[in-house]
Amino acid sequence: MKNKIFKVSSYAVFAAMLAISFAGCSSSSSSTPVASIPPTVQVKDTSGAVIAGATVYAIPSADVTAIATQPISLDGATGLYTAAAKKVDEPLEDLINGNYTPTGSGVATYQSGVTGVDGKVALASLPTNSTTYFLYVKPAASDTGHLPGGSLCRTAVTGASLANMVTAVKISTVQSASATYIGSSACIGCHASYATEKKTLHKLGIMVPKSPSALQDVSKFQGATDDENFYAGLNKFETGATVYYYTTGVTTTTGSFKTLSTPPTGTVTVYFTLVLSKVGGVYKAQFNNIKTPTDPNSGMVYDVALTYGGGLHKQRYMTKIGNSIYVIPLQYNPQGSDSSPDAGRTVWVEYNTVSLGWWDTANNVFTLPTTKKYKSFDVFCAGCHYTGYSVAENASGEFVSTAVADANGELHPVAGTKMEMNIGCESCHGPGSEHSAAGGNGKFIVTPKNLSPEREVMLCAACHTRGDSMGTAGTHGSVEALLDTNLKQMKPGTSRADFLANNTSASRNDAKIGDGLWADGKHSQKHHQQATDFIQTKKYRNGTALKTCASCHDVHAPGSDKHQLSGSSDNSLCISCHTTVVVVAHMTAKTGTSMGSSTKCIECHATKTAKSGSGSPTPGMTGASGTNYYQGDISSHRLDVTLKSSISSTNAMPIPYTSGCGSCHSTSGL
């Protein structure tokens, strides 16, 4: 009986399956196949609002590859970018704006469309194959609340990956012109996970001596050696130190003094000394004129109101005179050595004694920097350090600067109130008043990762380049910080084209030979030029993945080695992208010898051509010509290999020709 039931049941199931199967093949079926859709993009902003009226472009990777072949030429003699360079230095926006048109292609040929009220646009004619594109969003001309770029404009995607689906793209919002600064304390109140920024050197640059504010944490910089100790320079004030300013000639007309912390010997002329001390809890510098003892200013004492730098390469000291802040003509180099054959690599070095107005070379007497008020820290430097920077010239010709008020900030020595006198959240995200009033949630705030890559790089480049500013200190010419004619910093989200036009002068955009560049006109010699280097790399312009500073650096934390690297500098950070490179095999192929597994990518591709403090105080090697080859302390961000073949009689560097190089490369020809 059971067998009969089983057979009947099995037959019934089989019959039902056949019926369903045949029904699916019937021409009278009521079922509808899933309809295919063309590649569709939906644009929203960081608050989740859909964006209508924006144009979405599919930029062929081949065009970005093509623009990358065009040089970003910088005239080494003038520091001016050529007209042609300014048409190819923004890899996506120069294509979209028609500044560069690859042969047989260009913006007129791109698949594009305008988003509707639902934020969607169909790129109906986009080939859905292996061809790759960067998806770029340009808000409507009337849309002042959003910035161009988008979350899919950094890495190329295939047309096939966009087929038969709606692809989400997110763009950044931006503040209105009336937004105001509120200080990082307000930001961290909601975004507590980013409090790690307190440990970065961006936050530690300006400090009341040994009195970090509640927005500063020096714990990363309290090592046992001087070059790891943020307070190493101030410690020398406490034990007492005398710095001798001298020349090896009879006189000086340039103020280019040599310095030692012990009396110099030999045929020298000592002009003056700075006696460093700490008295009554105050750090002091006494100026004593040795050359002209009758100088009425000899013996003057200035208190150190603020330190400037520290923790890595150097530290300077600032004092208050009247209503302005001035830099004392002294720099501490924690890696320096008084036995160095290079006068710029000693423990203490003079800092612009004459140009800042501290010394009269004609009469060999002290002057006061108030004779050059236009070179005060307030107008010359603070623009790249203060959050919410503002400066004005008063009736006495003094330049008085302020930062955004913040109860946890640094004590301003002139105003007597606490301000955020260092780089903070709003330096890169823009003023936060509207964002805060709207309850956050991505409204009225610049989100760097959703900008075009060139605009994100500009957030750093605004200070990490070396040009002349469009803004001037009254009638006295341009200043060090690249300010506009209103003496304001570039607003986050600004394009490179607008920055060059509005913040750099018509006579100089960037570094030049003798002031920032080595004689090859390419490699950086001075600090804060990392962006000058980086825009020349394949990382910045290529047809695969457009990198920014934040691709390697963690902007919110000190990183693994104090340089805010996102990973270790032992090769793992490089190999996280260059996954197919076997380092030892690569080195062998390039150099013809096995370099060993301990060799680092950065030893060849990020050589320390530039100097901020002392760099290496002793030469790594001396060439056959007798030229000393030193190593700096700032890595070249061109990421190329500085070749020995680039050396000439007029260009002894930039190769930081250390013993590391010399272990395989001879000094012949140097």
Regions found by a protein language model. Name each.
Residues K2, S9, F14-V43, G48, ...:
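Bacterial Sec-dependent N-terminal signal peptides
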Residues V64-L126:
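Short, acidic Ser/Thr/Gly-rich low-complexity loop/linker segments typical of extracellular
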Residues V117, L123-A124, T128-G145:
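A short, solvent-exposed beta-strand micro-motif common in secreted/extracellular proteins
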Residues T40-G53, I59-V64:
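Structural motif
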Residues Q175-G189, I655-T658:
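Local sequence-structure signature of Cys/Sec-based thiol-disulfide redox active-site neighborhoods
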Residues Y194-I290, V301-T307, R316, T346-E350, ...:
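Primarily the internal scaffold of c-type cytochrome electron-transfer domains
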